[in-house]
Amino acid sequence: NQALARLADGPVWSPAYITISDFFRQHSELTIADPIKSICDLYKSYVEVTGNTNETLDHFYGWGQLLLADFDDIDKNMADAESGEQKAELRRFFANFDDNPEGLRERFITLWAKLNDIYNDFRQRLRGQKLAYEGMLYRDVVENAKIEVQYEHYIFVGFNVLQKVEQLLFKRFLKEEKASFYWDYDRYYMKSTNEAG
């Protein structure tokens, strides 16, 4: 605001500022769920899909955090939870490990085989409560919501690496000519003769 005031010849209205996360949240009927509640709901989906009632919530919690982070990445990158590419990557990862006494590798592969069903059940469970994790909410806005804009024009500032869901949002605004973009990057590395790193 101070820089804007220095450039102005007289009084000016200060622009509204909002984070990209808050922008997505404003345009969704869903609310971001508490992380602990999310893990508890994910556990319910896990038990429902796998039928495994022997695994306690306490034991599942660590797995649940990883699984929730994976689901968040899947949605922010507009990926498919049942991607064969992801399953092949998992096999390559575990090929480097000997099986441990607790059968960690087998348990994880069993879980991975049901990943898509757990993902879908979990999303449906959250949606029924009008809740979401961040990636789910972002994806919901981009895929389903007609974005009712509050302002005639938006200025997106300071981005350099975008997730797929953000790219799709920005493309929509660009297509509708409702936004300008100011990127955060070093011009030196943007020249074809220079190499980053």
Regions found by a protein language model. Name each.
Residues E152, E166-G197:
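Conserved RecA-like helicase ATPase core segment
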Residues A16-I18, I155, S180-Y182:
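Hydrophobic/aromatic beta-strand patches that form the interior of the parallel beta-sheet core
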Residues Q150-L162:
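Conserved P-loop NTPase "ATPase switch" module shared by AAA+ and STAND
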Residues S38, G158, A196-G197:
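Generic detector of short, well-ordered, non-transmembrane alpha-helical segments enriched
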Residues A3-V149, K164, D186:
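Basic/charged alpha-beta structural segments of nucleotide/phosphate-handling enzymes
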Residues H59-Y61, I155, N194:
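Generic detector of intrinsically disordered, low-complexity, polar/charged segments
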